[in-house]
Amino acid sequence: MKKNVLISVFVIFFSFFLNAQAKKSDFHLEVSQIFGLKDGMQNEFVYQFVENENAYKKLSQLDWEMKKLFYLGGKIDFRYRNFSFNFLGAGFLPQKSGTMTDSDWFGIASGFSEKTHLSKSENELSEGFFLDTSAGYRLNFSDFLSIKANFGFEYNYYFFMASNGYAWYGNSSTPYYSENAIFHPKSGKKEISLERINYSVYFLVNSEFHITRYFEVNPFFKVAPFSFFKEIDHHILREIFWYDSGNSFFSENQFGIEIIAKPLKKISFCFEYSYTFNIRYKGEIAANAEGEEKPFVLQKGIKSAFEQKMHNFSIGAKWSIF
């Protein structure tokens, strides 16, 4: 009985303590609903080592358009005095996403530098999501200006399907646009799937300009000290799987701006725009023709690479819990 009384007293005391801290504005908890779209392109490359030139030359390039990919998500912001912790999660709606273009240079080994194969397929995002978590500290220089530094982690997952493609096929000495190239009309079939994961550890600096008590403008810049990607291409018609992965340092960057309107004490509305781009970085590539779960064989003399350029637009409503 005495133990229960002590626990009750402790709970009551702790509740009053939290409430007092909240009233002092030391603790803040905010929840946001986010709706947005991403628009851009992700590119994958294959490079082959050419002995007579003693260099890696581009053998293949696949350009996966990401046109107006809508997503829904939520965000939680927790702050204690000048420290903050944030978590964001969002999922894409399955949708058409532009064109997948596949280009090949099969004559590079013999010194023929023209593009020999070109195909275009309808691209679709079957599923995808992204997660972002960060911790930061805010420096308040005045009522007008604050600077916030965040250290975080971002994770992205995409699964694309390219289908119903048409193509022009030359050979190792014939370009795709030649009269001697062979034209293949739309196939009406699923052709290539791409499962891609990329994540990064990043550092973000955010300037907060408090124009009025009802309006903020917050430009920001983000750089990733470490980035990693891995992807599996399934060439369905040939039943070949390609696996490639790689990492890089200080190759991914982002800049953007957030605009916040606060018409009510507990409710605010946000608009954000950002542009993400990375310096192309290379990795290893492996293959098999036995199935995705079978061992992949590392391809000697061949390298892979990853690149992306992405616009992001989002709007959100934010509720201040306390």
Language model feature labels by segment:
Residues 23-31, 70, 81-85, 143-149, ...:
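Outer-envelope beta-barrel architecture signal
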Residues 1-28, 322:
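Cleavable N-terminal export/targeting peptides
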Residues 29-39, 78, 87-93, 137, ...:
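Transmembrane beta-barrel strands of outer-membrane/channel proteins
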Residues 21-47, 60:
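Generic N-terminal amphipathic/basic segments
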Residues 72-78, 131-137, 151-155, 201-209, ...:
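Residues on the lipid-exposed face of transmembrane beta-strands in outer-membrane beta-barrel proteins
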Residues 40-69, 93-130, 156-200, 224-256, ...:
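Extracellular/periplasm-exposed beta-strand and loop segments of Gram-negative cell-envelope proteins
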Residues 264-270, 279-283:
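Substrate-binding/catalytic groove segments of enzymes
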Residues 64, 73-86, 90-95, 99:
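Post-signal peptide N-terminal segment of secreted/secretory-pathway proteins
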